[in-house]
């Protein structure tokens, strides 16, 4: 199974799927449009969250970073007058250093990610959507800014006018992504932000066309027409769709099986189940329910 993932909602589902599927039966293609260089290191926030989840390292309170991590380096950088916009943990920074050293030597992001996965003991395939540079830029009431600046530094507070993915027109799907699209029959679009997490993956050249030949299952990230986390509602409105399951489906396009929460008022064709995943048992229940639905469809 191929899973398309962002960095918060879908890892909660992966927490369950990894317990139910053999490693060779689970591959994850991850959004890279929120990647950026900070303090001399290349950060791939969504890839890192997926890797940490599969390696049982994720901080499940925040769904980013490593559990129990400290921020001694970040704190001392602030003391030195360095305006490091992200509160990077010390162990998390080690991941960034590992990746950045490889990238500076000319290694592609795909191979750097494979090396990181191996070092962490992750057996599942984790593949970036592209090896090219794509950046999510948000036009807001306070100016144009990188998505991480909007969401982390400004807590998603500015009004959003539009969302643009710079570099997307020139970017190509990674070779690993293309290989999985050829091999896998089922594609699961995880419950991540449909605009900034899943949107860039689907917008890569040829991806939507290839998905038409697959069994595509999508889990809405909304519960009761509200995102569980993140600024999805603002971003969906700026993209011209309502912050609802109907809006999610419109953004995702071709779907064979659309799964929404039991509380949803969506009236289109769908399957309903409890999709809120606050605990590992809830992640297991959702994962098991999805696998049953897929096998029966």
What are these regions (language model features)?
Residues 1-49:
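Gly/lys/ser-thr-rich phosphate-binding loops in alpha/beta enzymes
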Residues 19-24, 208-214, 252-253:
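Short, conserved loop/helix-junction motifs that constitute active-site signature segments
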Residues 27-31, 215-222, 257-262:
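Short internal beta-strands
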Residues 30-165:
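Electropositive, gly/pro-rich neighborhoods at or near active sites that engage anionic ligands
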Residues 33-34, 214-229, 275-276:
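Short, flexible loop segments at boundaries between secondary-structure elements
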Residues 228-297:
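C-terminal functional extensions of proteins
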